[in-house]
Amino acid sequence: MLQQQESPIPRLGVGEEGVVGRHVFGEVWGVNDKLLQDDEYLKNLVIKAAEVANMHLVDVKVWRFGGGDKGGVSVIALVLESHIAIHTWPAYNYATIDVYTCGEHSRPWDAYDYIIKQLNPKTFTKTIVDRSSK
């Protein structure tokens, strides 16, 4: 059973002008398939990315899919500000990355850039969307 936790950040995600939401997401190609299969590496990657971006980690969950030596991994970090997610397809050297935060104190683009640097893809996309209520 999940227990509700009080946020250490007053009015998380709500600024003077309304809700502040920032969404950074994209895709990576040409990543080493061994990295994309390494669930422990990916788990630690999102934990460090949350720290780099000034997010407050609540929990991290990891799932393996597809079996065999080319099965994918999904890692989702729940942070007080929202989430970080990585979904991998090692057989295609491909992954998707999603970082969403609420509030003005966190820097989702820093988390995204950190993940990109560590995965070292041959190519990637990066989309930044303002999801604020302003």
UniProtKB/Swiss-Prot annotation:
Record has Lyase as a keyword: yes
Details of cofactor binding: Binds 1 pyruvoyl group covalently per subunit.
Gene Ontology molecular function terms on file: adenosylmethionine decarboxylase activity; arginine decarboxylase activity
Taxonomic superkingdom: Archaea
CC cofactor: pyruvate
HAMAP family: AdoMetDC_1, ArgDC
PANTHER family: S-ADENOSYLMETHIONINE DECARBOXYLASE PROENZYME
Subunit structure: Heterooctamer of four alpha and four beta chains arranged as a tetramer of alpha/beta heterodimers.
Family the entry assigns: Belongs to the prokaryotic AdoMetDC family. Type 1 subfamily.
Name of this protein: Arginine decarboxylase proenzyme
Species for this entry: Caldivirga maquilingensis (strain ATCC 700844 / DSM 13496 / JCM 10307 / IC-167)
